[in-house]
Design a protein with these regions (language model features):
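Extracellular/periplasmic catalytic domains that process cell-envelope and extracellular macromolecules
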Residues: 39-41, 77, 104-105, 149-152
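Short active-site neighborhood of thiol/selenol oxidoreductases, capturing the structured segment around
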Residues: 35-60
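Cofactor-binding loop segments of dinucleotide-utilizing enzymes, especially the Rossmann-like FAD-
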Residues: 49-51, 85-87, 162
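Structural microenvironment flanking redox-active thiols in thiol-disulfide oxidoreductases
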Residues: 56-126, 138-145
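Short, solvent-exposed cationic patches
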Residues: 58-60, 183-194
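Thiol/disulfide oxidoreductase modules built on the thioredoxin-like
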Residues: 116-184
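N-terminal "domain-start" segment that seeds a small globular fold
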Residues: 2-37, 58-63
Length: 194
């Protein structure tokens, strides 16, 4: 259920896919539960499942920080909402993440926790919204990686249209991946308007 949308006239358009993402359950920092569908409804989004403390995530956060600094003064920030999905509450204290959150460059940034079920890594016990052991279900980052045809390697990032369709994804870290996602989301809006 993932198809690549191609247009030979524009290489950026060649990167755009159309993957229906599963509606996973996430928990906001204030403890309320929210579906991915509701979070992205009407908004271009970058969904980022982060592994705080790991080198690839540090690169992603530094890239977001640089983009946010360059967008400072623009009322819409980088032009899309950033949904940072953390593994645990203590991850919120991470220095670079705190720098991104403190910058307040106009982008809408939301901190979330994945409670959709499944294990956050191979050694962790699966958990659900009520803290019980899940029965073999994938957690949100694994499900998103699978739907976007990515390796199961954190961080997992997905550019998501306002209708909940994933249009570009990456895992691990690739230089410029966040900036590319911002550009792809802007191009997708232009493509829809054509």
């Amino acid at each position: 259920s993932c198809r690549k949308l191609q247009n030979k006239n524009n290489s950026l358009r060649e990167e755009i896919q159309s993957c229906l993402l599963r509606d996973i359950l996430l928990q906001r920092a204030d403890g309320t539960l929210c579906s991915l569908e509701k979070l992205v409804s009407g908004k271009r989004s970058i969904l980022a499942f982060l592994e705080i403390g790991a080198e690839p995530t540090e690169h992603v956060l530094n890239e977001v920080l640089a983009l946010e600094k360059s967008a400072k003064g623009n009322s819409k920030g980088i032009g899309c909402q950033l949904l940072f999905v953390l593994r645990q509450e203590k991850d919120l204290q991470h220095k670079t993440l705190q720098e991104v959150l403190a910058l307040d460059a106009g982008s809408e940034i939301e901190i979330l926790y994945d409670i959709s079920g499944g294990a956050s890594d191979a050694n962790a016990a699966p958990r659900t919204a009520i803290g019980d052991t899940a029965s073999g279900t994938l957690c949100g980052w694994q499900e998103t990686a699978k739907r976007m045809r990515l390796a199961e390697k954190l961080p997992v990032l997905a550019a998501v249209r306002p209708n909940g369709t994933g249009i570009y994804g990456t895992c691990g870290y690739h230089v410029g991946s966040v900036e590319l996602m911002v550009r792809i989301l802007k191009e997708a809006v232009r493509t829809e308007a054509d």
